[in-house]
Amino acid sequence: MAKHLFTSESVSEGHPDKIADQISDAVLDAILAQDPKARVACETYVKTGMVLVGGEVTTSAWVDIEELTRKTVREIGYTHSDMGFDADSCAVLNAIGKQSPDINQGVDRADPKEQGAGDQGLMFGYASNETEILMPAPITYAHALVKRQSEVRKNGTLPWLRPDAKSQVTFAYENNKIVGIDAIVLSTQHSPDIAQADLIEGVMESIIKPVLPAQWLSKDTKYFINPTGRFVIGGPMGDCGLTGRKIIVDTYGGMARHGGGAFSGKDPSKVDRSAAYAARYVAKNIVAAGLADRCELQVSYAIGVAEPTSISIETFGTGKVSEEVLIKLVRQHFDLRPYGLTEMLNLARPIYQATAAYGHFGRNEFPWEATDKAEALRADAGL
């Protein structure tokens, strides 16, 4: 029997890179709320006592960047100088400028349906039937752990927790089927007055056990809870944070390939984001239709050109029809031009800040997670 291990990691909303992602997407949402046709590319840098927000924007909207930044940091939980970062006292620098007219010229069209891609690039979408949400299990449960850390921090169950945390889960597979969890790593920032033994017990009882299915845990499962023994200094005081540095956490935890483009701070004309969402939508509908157990779709674009330069599909030997048939079905049922996918998924609206922590995929509140095309795909495939 073929056995293997596979590991994915996640980080909490208080991780420095995720603070940056959330600020970038908060700015994007605030602009889209006033101007759905805005062009936004917003990058954020955070370090002890400061936030730098930069990028390129073309819009009729006005947004109070400083107030928005402070509000976002406050909601995450950095509200005291003891943590090395305080929403009310940190410096906020605004370096946002206008998008190049050369890019506008390539993207905008008299007929909006012929809108060109905002850049060249390649994007991947993936789905697998190993979980109910058609996502790989390692990233799904890595997200669930840090999301739970945030919940018990905010509701007072574990009041000594602080916002920065990381998780990592290693699953054991036999013949590509899950047989158990081999190892769990959870590192969480904490106040200085909690003993290591109490922290380990609290994390195990209030975070790990409520989240991970008992049937996958065994006496051989290894647990690493704050393995350095101390994690008081964290967040932007521990490390600087940048938008777009957690692209594997944001997607499939390494289980699928990645085109390299980050998501946060980008409006839907940027195919790095919108086409990756559409590719997930396509792959998920193919798996939901029963046309494959696993599906990875690649799509690519040229700047200023509407039609994708390529579409390819890999089903890892699990396809019920050929990959040529699947590509034909994709072209028939999904409009992957930039305008088409924005319309198909209703992307020109302020829905992005919620994506910026705990993964962009596998969360049914987002439109790219719908499986409304599955029935038609199955019928047209003749199954």
Swiss-Prot record:
Keywords (A to Z) from UniProt: ATP-binding, Cytoplasm, Magnesium, Metal-binding, Nucleotide-binding, One-carbon metabolism, Potassium, Transferase
Cofactors required: Mg(2+); K(+)
SUPFAM superfamilies recorded: S-adenosylmethionine synthetase (SSF55973)
GO BP annotations listed: one-carbon metabolic process; S-adenosylmethionine biosynthetic process
InterPro entries given in the database record: ADOMET_SYNTHASE_CS, S-AdoMet_synt_C, S-AdoMet_synt_central, S-AdoMet_synt_N, S-AdoMet_synthetase, S-AdoMet_synthetase_sfam
Pfam families with a match to the protein in the record: S-AdoMet_synt_C, S-AdoMet_synt_M, S-AdoMet_synt_N
Binding site residues for K(+): 43
EC numbers for this chain: 2.5.1.6
Chief subcellular location: cytoplasm
Cofactor stoichiometry and binding remark: Binds 2 divalent ions per subunit.
Enzyme class of the recorded protein, top EC level: transferase
Binding site for Mg(2+): 17
Location of the region described as Flexible loop in the Swiss-Prot/TrEMBL record: 99-109
Pathway: Amino-acid biosynthesis; S-adenosyl-L-methionine biosynthesis; S-adenosyl-L-methionine from L-methionine: step 1/1
Binding residues for ATP: 15, 164-166, 230-231, 239, 245-246, 262, 266
Residues that coordinate or bind L-methionine: 56, 99, 239, 270
Cited function: Catalyzes the formation of S-adenosylmethionine (AdoMet) from methionine and ATP. The overall synthetic reaction is composed of two sequential steps, AdoMet formation and the subsequent tripolyphosphate hydrolysis which occurs prior to release of AdoMet from the enzyme.
Subunit structure comment from the entry: Homotetramer; dimer of dimers.
PANTHER family reported in the protein's UniProt record: S-ADENOSYLMETHIONINE SYNTHETASE
Family indicated by similarity: Belongs to the AdoMet synthase family.
Name of the protein described by the UniProt record: S-adenosylmethionine synthase
